Amino acid sequence: MKNILNKIYLHPLLLITIFIFILMGRFKFILYFMLLILVHELGHILVSLIFKWKIDKIIILPFGGLTKYNQLINTPLIEEFLVSISGILFQTFFYVIINKYIDYKYVYLIHYFIIIFNLLPIYPLDGAKILNVVFNKITSFKNSILLTAIISYLTIFFLSLILFNINKIVFMLLIFLFIEVNNFYKERELLFNKFLFERYTHSLKFKKEKLINNVDKMKKDYKHLFYIDNKYMTENTFLKKRFDIKGNL
């Protein structure tokens, strides 16, 4: 537990938000806000530890936490889904319990704001991660990254038009999220190459197999059989040829 506490980082946006609410005299508001944010992130952390994910850093933001993992890209989709949704479920369960004993009318607003905001399809929010799992179920890994980034950009654009003159704090959060989405989009080729290189260097087991004719069609949770130039080739053989020629990343 001490090791995890050492990895917690309070983002400047969170400190600004706390300062603003303290100036406004909203001590109870910020207290319950922080409590629900920490409970939300605790849900992610507990489930990730069950799957033995390695935690690099836990960033606490005004809308929740952002836990960065040192984890294989080829992690099973079911694990990604359960870790992504666990924060919302854990927070909701906690809220249902404490709501009976807390006499503060704004607790429900805080709870639903955190839930709704985290369900927005903007990377790296929970909503976008869950959506990315869905995309990975129906299309290739490469397409999933692109689709997640496009939907994230569009959501930020429309929310910015609505909130620019309404809520400056949320607008600042959208600017932060835009930077995160932009980095995610710029690194899509690097992520794809890491996705391939992991399969080349690790003995990964998959129950399902798929026949494809292009490396861009590779999917998570699948082993692939390539059919190129009228020849069949196993995934291992294809990746060996690819990285023997290109060398390391």
Residue ranges, per PLM feature:
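Hydrophobic transmembrane alpha-helices and their immediate loop junctions
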Residues: 1-249
